[in-house]
Amino acid sequence: FTTVLDSTMLNASIIEALRCDQIRRIYFVGQGTAGIAAQACADILSYYLNDSKFFIDALKASELSGFKMSTHDSPDSMSDTLVIAISQSGTTTDTNRTVDMVRGRGARTLAIVNRRDSDITFKVEGVMYTSSGRDIEMSVASTKAFYSQIVAGAILGLHMAAATGRRDITFVTEEIKKLLELPAHMKKVLGQAKAIEASARRLAATKTYWAAVGSGPNKASADEIRIKLSELCYKTISSDYVEDKKHIDLSSEPLILVCAAGAKSSVIGDIIKDTAIFKAHKATPVIIADEGETRFDPYAEDIFHVPVTSEHLAPILNTLVGHLWGY
């Protein structure tokens, strides 16, 4: 397997700039759910490039434009930078304004967008269309957009890694196989919809305070679950790193959605220990874990197992459980 992106998506001059180390900084930007997808995409690209020469980060578009740039910047102050904007509608003011500002400082620009011929598509050098739902619509449910944005970011990152010689054809083939497995994995999670609904109906009203937690790539899952729970349930909900939660507000005895699927072996033991602490403080842990993982059982109020996938792709499956629980 290989990736094929034409020049309307990623042009040769950007690839050459990456290959020759003319681009050293790569930012994924967006707002809201697109900003969370940016976080997941940055984690994936860091894994794919696997090169400390690159500084790869995700920022809210408004943070990049508001606090990482100044009116005193020179016209080439970001000439070593690639900015990849993510937007469902292509009309998000903060994101589009940020693209204008980085271009004015010499940055190269790409976009991952759902709506064809939207404003942002005329501002950037290359566009990957996600086409979730009807891509002529201004608004498409951001649940669908979120998953496709992450996969688009993965394909883009994989292409960059291969084109610059940082990953070989064997690696690319295995990663594409993993991406192709995701729809079947997601269908398997959707098959648990009734059990997830039963959990939400049984537990949601028992706790005043809710939280979502995740660490590493799964912090993106926690952040996105928090957004949907807040939107759907009209509640202010926290999103924290798993290890940090015990230092924050366990005295409130919250209901905690723990995004643990895909966590690597060196970390999962600590997440289990932290979950035991949550339980000891009379919190209500609802766990999302890999199939076959039984060590959470003594501490989980409910546990949902998802198919095993790589750590960098696991946010998709963790988030899907959280989305269903929220609905």
Where are these regions (language model features)?
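A SIS-like phosphosugar-recognition module
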Residues: F1-Y327
